[in-house]
Amino acid sequence: MSQLVVTGANGFVGRAVCRRALDAGYTVTALVRRPGGCIDGVREWVHDGGDFDGLGERWPAGLRADAVIHLAARVHVMRDESPDPDAAFDAINVAGTLRLAKAAHRHGVRRIVYASSIKAVGERDGGVPLSETASPDPQDAYGRSKLRAERLLQQFGAANGLDVVVVRPPLVYGPTVRANFLRMMDAVARGMPLPLGSIPARRSIVYVDNLADALLRCATDPRAVGECFHVADDDAPSVTGLLRLVGDALGKPARLIAVPSVVLRGLGALTGRRAAIDRLTDSLQLDTGRITRVLGWHPPYTTREGLEATAAWYRSRNTQQ
């Protein structure tokens, strides 16, 4: 295999996937909505519109890709103001994914790797790390859209001879990370007291270069065909442990105050932040044994190595501002 298409290639995960693919000798076409932001060395293909309408008619002449790694999505947001969140997510994450699959199949692509999310399964593990056989129970519109896209994509692939691989990551971190993980780093770096010093809940996370490595393996390994894989770092730290690791990486110990989980949940209910607190106090561990058994894949980086790389970026970012 030599030709890959990566959607969302100018995003956080997309840049990491493209970098790893180029380093491995692949030719990469970056399918993006807006120009700019891609790494050097890729062929940029701008298609305005996240729903991929008309993609088949605008497929570049001469592009004969072997696989598509599909990262583009309407992403999860904490306070979605759409009048119909399910419809808004489905328009991009479900209908758009199917349009992409149809266009890719029409133009000879043999495999699509779909970057789903553990949110397609749920928000907590119930005391047992979530495997690929766990009964899905998505809790929000984003998770529901990801699950629907998985199922419809698998049906389309089975009916049309398109190889489909689904990858479900948890929270992704690494250099250029944004949103909640960056806010957490800001809080630790500024020495803010955090009431999370006694949270035993364990949360799987994945370093962006580990995820990129797994996605590329799924695009190229024949044993991945038809599979669904949970992908995460090897260790799932407790919430308290993660904050300490972040502090170590930043060279600034996290200021942690021991507040029982039950108290935090009560405060969350009183302040209207129940969902956010539940995500901190409930465990969400992934069972990643399947990708190891089927593909022999292991994360190339430890969580500590990933956090050190993220902290190095964070420090350089602050010196450049």
Residue map of PLM features:
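N-terminal Rossmann NAD(P)H-binding glycine-rich loop of SDR-like oxidoreductase domains
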Residues: 4-24
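NAD(P)H-binding glycine-rich loop region in Rossmannoid oxidoreductase-like domains
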Residues: 47-94, 99, 103-106, 121
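Conserved Rossmann-fold NAD(P)-dependent oxidoreductase catalytic core, especially the SDR/UDP-sugar
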Residues: 98-141
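Substrate-positioning beta->alpha
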Residues: 99, 177-183, 197-219, 226-227
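Active-site Tyr-X1-5-Lys
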Residues: 137-165
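Glycine-rich Rossmann NAD(P)(H)-binding loop
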Residues: 174, 196-201, 229-236, 245-251, ...
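Conserved C-terminal active-site "lid" loop/helix of NAD(P)H-dependent oxidoreductases
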Residues: 208, 241-244, 267-298, 309
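Mid/C-terminal beta-alpha module of Rossmann-like enzyme folds, strongest
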Residues: 217-275, 304, 308-311
